[in-house]
């Protein structure tokens, strides 16, 4: 079974390339003049976008714009998702008002105009 990779060059001429699934990126360099995008349909790898910016994963290579960059797909897949801090819930404050309970009084610290420097603390 062979897969077809089609390089689209900026002047809209197309250069087909036939290859196996193991060698998804050709040994010879793709057409160098102009800006190209890759349309790839094969084993498990698909094209993400077509008009404007195109992003594909082709055999462990990320293809976007001018040149394919070697990126390990396993390392990208193992990146942890960004964590967000839990949002503060204000439902308890509103429920206390509904029940007629007074909120607990917290004494505020008095802020003095001057801070003590380490020299004054030591001496």
Swiss-Prot record:
Top-level taxon of origin: Eukaryota
Stretches with biased composition (Basic residues): 105-117
Region annotation Disordered: where it falls in the sequence: 67-123
Name of this protein: DPEP2 neighbor protein
Species whose genome carries this gene: Homo sapiens
């Amino acid at each position: 079974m062979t897969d077809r990779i089609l390089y689209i060059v900026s002047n809209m001429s197309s250069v087909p390339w036939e290859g196996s699934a193991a060698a998804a990126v050709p040994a010879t360099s793709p057409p160098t003049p102009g800006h190209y995008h890759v349309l790839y349909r094969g084993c498990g790898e698909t094209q993400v976008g077509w008009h404007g910016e195109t992003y594909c994963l082709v055999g462990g290579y990320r293809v976007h714009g001018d040149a394919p960059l070697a990126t390990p797909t396993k390392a990208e897949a193992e990146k942890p998702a960004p964590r967000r801090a839990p949002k503060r819930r204000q439902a308890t404050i509103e429920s206390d008002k509904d029940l007629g309970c007074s909120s607990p009084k917290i004494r505020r610290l008095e802020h003095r105009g001057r801070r003590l420097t380490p020299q004054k603390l030591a001496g």
